[in-house]
Amino acid sequence: MKSETRFQILVSVAALGMSMLTGYAASQTPSNTLASPDSFASISDTGTRSAAMFTELGKVLTNPRCTNCHPAGDRPHQTDASRLHQPPVARGPDGHGTETMRCSICHGNANFDPGRMPGHPEWHLAPREMAWEGKSIAEICAQITDPARNGGRKVEDLIHHIGEDTLVGWAWHPGYGRSPAPGTQKEAGALVEAWVKTGAACPAK
């Protein structure tokens, strides 16, 4: 084998190996961290790269900090184990509770760690059309990209909602006794923005 041919083969093998390692690093990040959009640069197909970034974001969307307030029914869940809220409460007509049991009766403007009580000025449940408790990442993606099932929202709206909304941001600062969502809000926002800019493709499963 000529030295030039041998060199070309070695270069090709090395490039393939680096590509595989980069893809592995992006898809195998620990469950409590988030890969950056740059981690997916080795995926040449734009749609595949976009779907891969949403899959990474799915670590946040399927975390109890999110699913507890995006329930399939009208009762929120609580704790890392996603138990039904105690005392029993209901969504109510506006997501802020019933007339006699408003969320704000117990949930103040900020976390109250001595009582393990989470809080935020706008504490409430997500709208019914944004319920994704028990759904796969692919099903969540299909739902939030469909205006008929997401309250008429554009995918671009998610850049601000996930990346900057302070109630969503609570998920990364949930207070005593609760595990935060993976990564940081800034990292999640960067993934959403990159996902939208690459076509907002959904994973197949």
Q: Can you say where each PLM-predicted feature lies in the sequence?
A:
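The canonical Cys-X-X-Cys-His
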Residues: P64-G73, T100-A110
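Electrostatic cytochrome c docking/interface patches
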Residues: S39-V60, P76, D80-H96
